[in-house]
């Protein structure tokens, strides 16, 4: 795993001083064509740790979390710092195991407004909305992903247990987010991000 996302072949020239000589850059690329960030409302227990590990394996570029209206978990600054440190270790291990070129960014927001202020940096924001799934909506996700060019930045927003509140949905829509169902079944807060990333992989890698 390298900071710039490029894998390289090197030869050890000095073991004591840990000096390497670059032999060549390798074309191997294990990253998704889209820069995908997953953002979850603070879930209960250790669900975020599980989400961080599995979404890293599936190609997420960043794992974010924020205090949603219906989040049961309440984390202050000190708890957030400790949680972030734990998550960073988890994603590093998962990135190595899955032979990623990059280690995903971990960012936990203490205030929801700070999270919302970051939405403008994305080319597309998709909100996983269970009401869309109940209504049988199935095209929004496919359309939103396939319209994007390679390298585009996409943000998926997921609610905690109980989902996002009507006020949050309204705010996200006002900010230009797209509401999308994730298939005909209602998914748990820790399962939905995996579905979304798998869909991105199928649409941008396997079907190309």
Question: Predicted segments — roles?
Answer:
Residues 7-15:
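Short beta-strand-centered aromatic/proline hotspots
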Residues 26, 132-133, 184-187:
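Short, acidic/turn-prone active-site loops that include or flank metal/cofactor-
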Residues 43, 47, 161-165, 185:
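Gly/Ser/Thr-rich beta-alpha loop segments that engage phosphate groups in nucleotides
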Residues 72-73, 135, 189, 196:
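Generic structural signal for helix capping and beta-alpha/helix-loop junctions
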Residues 125-163, 167-169, 177-181:
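Active-site/ligand-binding-proximal alpha/beta "capping" segment
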Residues 165-208:
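Structured adenosyl-cofactor binding patch, chiefly the S-adenosyl-L-methionine
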């Amino acid at each position: 795993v390298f900071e710039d996302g490029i894998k390289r072949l090197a030869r050890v020239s000095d073991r004591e001083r840990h000096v390497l000589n670059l032999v060549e850059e390798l074309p191997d690329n294990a990253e998704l064509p889209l820069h995908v960030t997953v953002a979850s409302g603070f879930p209960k227990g250790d669900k975020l740790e599980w989400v961080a590990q599995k979404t890293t394996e599936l190609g997420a570029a960043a794992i974010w979390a924020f205090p949603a209206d219906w989040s049961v978990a309440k984390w202050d600054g000190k708890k957030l710092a400790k949680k972030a440190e734990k998550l960073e270790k988890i994603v590093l291990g998962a990135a190595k195991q899955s032979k990623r070129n990059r280690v995903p960014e971990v960012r936990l927001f203490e205030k929801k407004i700070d999270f919302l202020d970051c939405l403008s940096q994305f080319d597309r924001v998709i909100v996983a909305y269970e009401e869309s799934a109940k209504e049988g909506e199935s095209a929004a996700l496919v359309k939103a992903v396939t319209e994007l060019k390679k390298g585009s930045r996409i943000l998926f927003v997921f609610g905690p247990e109980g989902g996002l509140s009507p006020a949050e949905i309204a705010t996200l829509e006002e900010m230009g987010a797209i509401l999308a169902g994730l298939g005909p079944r209602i998914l748990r807060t820790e399962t939905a991000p995996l579905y979304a990333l798998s869909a991105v992989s199928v649409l941008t890698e396997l079907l190309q």
